UniProtKB/Swiss-Prot annotation:
This is Bcl-2-like protein 1. It comes from Homo sapiens. Homodimer. Interacts with BCL2L11. Interacts with BAD. Interacts with PGAM5. Interacts with HEBP2. Interacts with p53/TP53 and BBC3; interaction with BBC3 disrupts the interaction with p53/TP53. Interacts with ATP5F1A and ATP5F1B; the interactions mediate the association of isoform Bcl-X(L) with the mitochondrial membrane ATP synthase F(1)F(0) ATP synthase. Interacts with VDAC1. Interacts with BCL2L11 (via BH3). Interacts with RNF183. Interacts with GIMAP3/IAN4 and GIMAP5/IAN5. The chain crosses the membrane at residues 210-226. A motif (BH1) lies at residues 129-148. The lineage of its organism: Eukaryota, Metazoa, Chordata, Craniata, Vertebrata.
Length: 233
């Protein structure tokens, strides 16, 4: 699963960089040996501790937060959703999340004070806070959006070397700490079922399903994420 998770990370970061006029190919070969794992081998992917600092990830004991429960039963008889659909759903959900918190994301520069020496610490602290009370799909979207914003900020500040590092940190965290919850809650198929086909934006417009899952996922994630950003000095 490590390669497919990394593929999701790279696709999302590529998309976010392209929105700002940057190309992933400009940065993908920078310190490539730090982020690329030989195909089919998760254990050989370099961990964040070997890049910049020691990880101290912590998650709540219970994975069910804010109404996030398993959906696997509704998907038992369904074919596996193509990776392309997962990528598209992540892109759309990320866009919707950032639209709702546009002002806060535009303030990342002054809040994080990124440098090559402190980027990992900033990433670690925000992600720890984001998942402190557990995992849900909205917080996973926030996780991807934060990583994308961090990459764009790094490039804007001419610290392109951080892009490949951030991709590695995200892939490692996704594999080690989010993958178990994802599998217990129906896998990425469930994510596409909830967030695919621009569901977040459509729900916001129609309000029919918006209060049921978006407010208990994305909005809570936004509050947690932005709270962790703005509490930093």
């Amino acid at each position: 699963m490590s390669q497919s998770n990394r593929e999701l990370v790279v696709d999302f970061l590529s998309y976010k960089l392209s929105q700002k006029g940057y190309s992933w190919s400009q940065f993908s070969d920078v310190e490539e040996n730090r982020t690329e794992a030989p195909e089919g081998t998760e254990s050989e992917m370099e961990t964040p501790s070997a890049i910049n600092g020691n990880p101290s990830w912590h998650l709540a004991d219970s994975p069910a937060v804010n109404g996030a429960t398993g959906h696997s039963s509704s998907l038992d008889a369904r074919e596996v959703i193509p990776m392309a659909a997962v990528k598209q759903a992540l892109r759309e959900a990320g866009d919707e999340f950032e639209l709702r918190y546009r002002r806060a994301f535009s303030d990342l520069t002054s809040q994080l004070h990124i440098t090559p020496g402190t980027a990992y610490q900033s990433f670690e602290q925000v992600v720890n806070e984001l998942f402190r009370d557990g995992v849900n799909w909205g917080r996973i979207v926030a996780f991807f959006s934060f990583g994308g914003a961090l990459c764009v900020e790094s490039v804007d500040k001419e610290m392109q070397v951080l892009v490949s590092r951030i991709a590695a940190w995200m892939a490692t965290y996704l594999n080690d700490h989010l993958e178990p919850w994802i599998q217990e809650n129906g896998g990425w198929d469930t994510f596409v079922e909830l967030y695919g086909n621009n569901a977040a934006a459509e729900s916001r417009k129609g309000q029919e399903r918006f209060n049921r899952w978006f407010l208990t996922g994305m909005t809570v994630a936004g509050v947690v994420l932005l709270g962790s950003l703005f509490s930093r000095k």
